[in-house]
From Swiss-Prot:
Organism field: Nocardioides sp. (strain ATCC BAA-499 / JS614)
Listed GO biological process terms: base-excision repair, AP site formation via deaminated base removal
Lineage: Bacteria, Bacillati, Actinomycetota, Actinomycetes, Propionibacteriales
Cell location: Cytoplasm
Molecular-function GO terms, alphabetical: uracil DNA N-glycosylase activity
Homology family: Belongs to the uracil-DNA glycosylase (UDG) superfamily. UNG family.
InterPro entries noted in UniProt: UDG_fam1 (IPR002043), Ura-DNA_Glyclase_AS (IPR018085), Uracil-DNA_glycosylase-like (IPR005122), Uracil-DNA_glycosylase-like_sf (IPR036895)
Protein name: Uracil-DNA glycosylase
Gene3D superfamilies: Uracil-DNA glycosylase-like domain
Function: Excises uracil residues from the DNA which can arise as a result of misincorporation of dUMP residues by DNA polymerase or due to deamination of cytosine.
Reactions accelerated catalytically: Hydrolyzes single-stranded DNA or mismatched double-stranded DNA and polynucleotides, releasing free uracil
Main location group: cytoplasm
EC nos: 3.2.2.27
Residue numbers annotated as active site: 71
Length: 230
């Protein structure tokens, strides 16, 4: 059984994503070996198990907005396989997510919740994709360049081939470097929401209302960015 077929069989990846990622099936298998070797060497990784490919559990056909992150939070037990999101019981929230919530309030007047679980966005077709899908706890960027990038690039290329209605939200230089890959897909871009750069143009960039406007212009439905309070 191929790596992708195994993921679909376990309910960890939508079938249309498995079809789109067929060109990197061997690379996905190689990443599985890499992660097993990490564990054998006493080096854990996160997120684990069913959350590694969580961004691919909703169908490719349903994706309306792509938000690209760098890699999962390195804080132990924080990441849930969706970029910028954390487990619902994590407190305090990561500073980048606090700034995202501040911009959400300023942009759309929506009161942010106390939790950092962004599953409600994913359920509406917002793909929260990290360029690297795993990280060693406590070591940011530790799995960068280990082999995830060709896989996530293939995913982005699949979205571009599928076409709109689709909007890409690119925060920070790493994400913005992907713009040439996106072709004619409308893009909303700004500095990263990190405290190091949020005041250099993330605050006031209104990404949520701008993305909705671009979706509607393509004949799509606007995203309801409100998150459940609990």
């Amino acid at each position: 059984m191929s790596a992708l077929a195994g993921l679909v069989d376990k309910g960890l990846m939508a079938p249309d994503w498995a079809q789109a990622l067929a060109p990197v099936d061997e690379q996905i298998a190689a990443m599985g070996r890499f992660l097993r070797e990490e564990l054998a060497a006493g080096r854990t990784y996160q997120p684990t198990g069913e959350w590694v490919f969580r961004a691919f559990q909703r169908p490719l056909a349903d994706v309306r907005v792509l938000i690209v992150g760098q890699d999962p939070y390195p804080n132990p037990e924080h990441p849930i396989g969706l970029s910028f999101a954390v487990r619902g019981d994590v407190w305090p929230l990561p500073p980048s997510l606090v700034n995202i919530y501040t911009e959400l309030r300023d942009d759309l007047g929506l009161m942010p919740p106390r939790h950092g679980d962004l599953t409600a966005w994913a359920d509406q077709g917002v793909m929260l994709l990290n360029r690297s899908l795993t990280v060693r706890p406590g070591a940011s960027n530790s799995h960068r360049g280990k082999g995830w990038e060709p896989i996530t690039a293939c995913a982005i290329e699949a979205l571009v081939r599928r076409g709109g209605p689709l909007v890409a939200i690119l925060w920070g230089s790493d994400a913005r470097n992907l713009r040439p890959m996106l072709g004619q897909i409308p893009v909303v871009e700004s500095p990263h929401p990190s405290p190091l750069s949020a005041y250099r143009g993330f605050f006031g960039s209104r990404p949520f209302s701008r993305a909705n406007r671009l979706l509607v212009e393509q004949g799509g439905r606007a995203v309801d960015w409100a998150l459940p309070m609990e």
